[in-house]
Amino acid sequence: MRRIKVIFFDLDDTLVDTSKLAEVARKNAIENMIRHGMPVDFDTAYNELLELIKEYGSNFPYHFDYLLRRLDLEYNPKWVAAGVIAYHNTKFTYLREVPGARKTLLRLKKEGYMTGIITDGNPIKQWEKILRLELDDFFEHVMISDFEGVKKPHPKIFKKALKAFNVKPEEAIMVGDRLYSDIYGAKNVGMKTVWFKYGKYAELDLEYKEYADYVITELPQLLEVLERENGSDKEVHSSG
């Protein structure tokens, strides 16, 4: 009998390639603000924006408004609009799945696995990514921290996801790119864990690496993990 019944995925840089996307979108936003008259050089404005994001978080809705204050400029709605338009146009144009994501999800569905998402972030933004990439039909349940009221690695969000599928922790695997929030968090409630070593967090929080049962560098390698967990002796090969 199959031991693993449910596979949970993080969203950003696990299913959706967002690290590169965000960088390009932010740069295009600054360039467009300057193009429309903002009297600051690119490096000064971009570095200030990065500091602002670091301080307030990526989901803060007033990045460009606050940027003008930080640059000691008078508020100009035209410049803010220029930044917002360029940011969103870039995001919508270049939004991509992580290589191999759809292929892996199709295979999981074909083999009868249940799948869910456990992600941090703004619910509207996260659903927008899921819907624009037409990934919603793959998942029975989607747990988003800002909607659930609790962020990873808090055990409550993982336990709520398990309850939604009516499975025990040992019957589920969590796949994510962040060792602390995804891997440490899931392991603490008794789930199996797969660290997807990908994107900007690939070299961060390495002190939590011991909580990863498996390490993969390409999503299709997850299929080998499942074969091994469900009785096959096949080894999982990671390229990194």
Swiss-Prot record:
Keywords: Hydrolase, Magnesium, Metal-binding. Its EC number is 3.1.3.-. Disulfide bonds: none annotated. This is Glyceraldehyde 3-phosphate phosphatase. The keyword Hydrolase applies. It is an enzyme of class 3 (hydrolase). Catalyzes the dephosphorylation of D,L-glyceraldehyde 3-phosphate in vitro. One of its GO terms (molecular function) is phosphatase activity. Pfam families: Hydrolase. GO terms for biological process: small molecule biosynthetic process. InterPro entries: HAD-like_hydrolase (IPR051400), HAD-like_sf (IPR036412), HAD-SF_hydro_IA (IPR006439), HAD-SF_hydro_IA_CTE7 (IPR011950), HAD-SF_hydro_IIIA (IPR006549), HAD_sf (IPR023214).
